[in-house]
Amino acid sequence: MIKVDLQHSGLSIADLNEAKVKKVHEMIINKSGKGNDFLGWIEWPKTFDKKEYEEMKKVASSLRNKIDVLVTVGIGGSYLGIRAADEMIRGINHSDKVQVIYAGHTMSSTYVAQLSEYLKGKKFGICVISKSGTTTEPGIAFRALEKQLIEQVGVEASKELIVAVTDSSKGALKTLADNKGYPTFVIPDDIGGRFSVLTPVGIFPLLVAGVNTDNIFAGAIKAMDELVQGDLTNEAYKYAAARNALYNAGYKAEALVAYELQMQYTAEWWKQLFGESEGKDNKGLYPTSMIFSTDLHSLGQWVQEGARNVLFETVIKVKEPVANMLVEADTDNYDGLNYLSGKSFHEINSTAIEGVIDAHVNTGKMPNIVLEFDKMNDVQFGYLVYFFEIAVAMSGYLLEVNPFDQPGVEVYKYNMFKLLGKPGVK
């Protein structure tokens, strides 16, 4: 369901260090590398708790019938994967019953105040997601939203409208939820935040949204079954090895390029996955993203003629659109675009992909890796999640870093807590 095309990358199979790929594969399978206690995601699509899943379906169905808006409260891996899935699968301007909106991913007072105003008089529920319950952004957002919901519907009714996804037995959020009677679902101990979208972190909100999560798991299982080879016939490993080869050739940044607006947050999720997994020990590609053709009208000039040997592109090419439209002829043809009449928007978009790759690669000397996707749907989303997760494990180990920790984020947190006067921080 994802094919890696390297014909525009400037790389040959000989450049991809297959011998090292095979060694790293053994590390992953045997769980002998750094961070091996966070490899629970590898078997998760087949081994997740089916009893908990059925309970999630029941609670989600009940909540869905009571609300028009679900506010998910979380940040990082407790935010990006949910939004990536919802927008890729349901689209941006959908008309489904339940709207999903987000809080706890920013400390902007303006955003929180406007969100509060928007929710006044609306039937809304809350899914708060945090392993510890002490993360600043979701913590303060949940305080405000919980208070507002209780004021709107009362304490007893709120117990059926608030769900927590958190630790199985400990932590501030687990304690709060148990004390107040909110249902809880479990964030596994052996799966890090950026790998958690297929756990209750992502699955519960998506169930409330009405997404077919069985199909998401089916896609992930298909990826598990297909991406088993320990060599470069494994498409995920081929992608990881190619980006590693370009890094070793001196490239500093990788831009994930999508031509579909509803994949914007898939790219945001990908940035966290690769940025937190690889950006350590003064190593790692800087992950960025662009949405074409939109960003061709802003960043296209830099990509075409800016500094060379800094950036390469990884282009997502979707073969089948979710929906399609034809360009109609106009009698006056004021814009001179009648030559496109009868063509579909997707055909024009696909042609743009080919033209842009040709311009960036052959004229601009910008390496391109192309990832060919079948379509944008629930099965494909499950597949791409597993594809990128196994790819980043390989890529991180090729880089000889621990792909499963993120020690660098503690520095800014310490400084912020010190300035805010958090007890115990000096």
Swiss-Prot record:
Keyword Isomerase: yes
A GO BP annotation: gluconeogenesis
Keywords of the record: Cytoplasm, Gluconeogenesis, Glycolysis, Isomerase
Active site: 276, 297, 413
Coiled coil: none
This protein's pathway: Carbohydrate biosynthesis; gluconeogenesis; Carbohydrate degradation; glycolysis; D-glyceraldehyde 3-phosphate and glycerone phosphate from D-glucose: step 2/4
InterPro entries named in the record: G6P_Isomerase, Phosphoglucose_isomerase_CS, SIS_dom_sf, SIS_PGI_1, SIS_PGI_2
A Pfam cross-reference name: PGI
Subcellular location: Cytoplasm
Keyword Cytoplasm: yes
Catalytic reactions on record: alpha-D-glucose 6-phosphate = beta-D-fructose 6-phosphate
EC class of the enzyme, as a word: isomerase
PROSITE patterns: P_GLUCOSE_ISOMERASE_1, P_GLUCOSE_ISOMERASE_2, P_GLUCOSE_ISOMERASE_3
Alphabetized SUPFAM superfamilies for the sequence: SIS domain
GO CC, one annotated term: cytosol
UniProt GO MF annotations: carbohydrate derivative binding; glucose-6-phosphate isomerase activity; monosaccharide binding
EC number: 5.3.1.9
Top-level division of the source organism's lineage: Bacteria
HAMAP family reported for this sequence: G6P_isomerase (MF_00473)
PANTHER family with a match to the protein in the record: GLUCOSE-6-PHOSPHATE ISOMERASE (PTHR11469:SF1)
Stated family: Belongs to the GPI family.
Function, as annotated: Catalyzes the reversible isomerization of glucose-6-phosphate to fructose-6-phosphate.
Protein name: Glucose-6-phosphate isomerase
Organism of origin: Mesoplasma florum (strain ATCC 33453 / NBRC 100688 / NCTC 11704 / L1) (Acholeplasma florum)
